[in-house]
Amino acid sequence: MKVLLLNGSPKANGNTAYALSQMAEVFAAEGVETEILQVGNQPIRGCIACGSCRKTGKCVFDDVVNQAAEAFREADGLVAASPVYYASANATLVAFLDRLFYSTGFDKRMKVGASVVVARRGGCSATFDELNKYFTISGMPVASSHYWNSVHGRAPGEAAQDLEGIATVRNLAKNMTFLMKAIALGKEKFGLPELDPVSPTHFIR
C-alpha cells in the first residue's frame, strides 16, 4: 500500500513539509509506503487546453507532472498539501493538479484523497475546499480527521508548536490508512461499483 504526498510549498523544509513528515511517520508505523514529491518550488506552467493528452495519455509539457503520473497511478492514496496564499492554494500546486488530473486517463475511483493546508492565520477553509474538489470530481473518497486539516505557523518550524494541528494531520494519516485498507478489502470481495453511463450536457442544451 502506497501514498503519494505532494508538497505544494516553495519551501522544501517549511511548515507544510513538517506537516507531511508527521503524516509520513504515521504511515510508516502503519506499514504504508510513502513518496513525498516537492512541487511548490518547480517551474510548472498551467494547462493550455491543447487536447494533446487525449491522444497521447500524457501532458504535452513533459515535466514533473508526467513524472508524477505513474506514481499516482500506482498509489492507493494522494495527499495534496499547500500553504495558503490569499485564501487559495499555491498557484504552482494548482497548475500541477489541473494538469495531473486532466491528463491522466486511468481510473482514479476509490483512491483515497486528503488535503492539508498551512497558514499563518486565515484562509484555511477556502483552500481546504479548493483542494478537495480534485478528489470529489474524480470518484476519490476523501479522508477526514477529527477537525479540518489545517496547521498554523509562519516561520519554518512554527508548525511544531501547533499541537492541535499536528494531532489533526497525524489522525488524518491514521484514518486514511484505515480507509485505504477497508476499500482494498471491499474491492477484493465486491469489486468496484458498476456506474451508470454519463451523457455530458451543457446548460444551454
Listing of model-derived features with the role each one plays in the protein:
Residues 2-30:
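N-terminal beta1-alpha1 ligand-phosphate binding loop
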Residues 32-42:
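A short beta-strand-loop structural module common to alpha/beta enzyme folds
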Residues 42-72, 199-205:
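Cysteine-cluster motifs in flexible loop/terminal segments that predominantly coordinate metals
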Residues 51-55, 132, 161-163:
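Short, hinge-like loop/turn segments at secondary-structure boundaries
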Residues 60-147:
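Helix-loop-strand module that forms the ligand-binding subsite of alpha/beta enzymes
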Residues 141-205:
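Glycine-rich phosphate/pyrophosphate-binding loop and the adjoining helix
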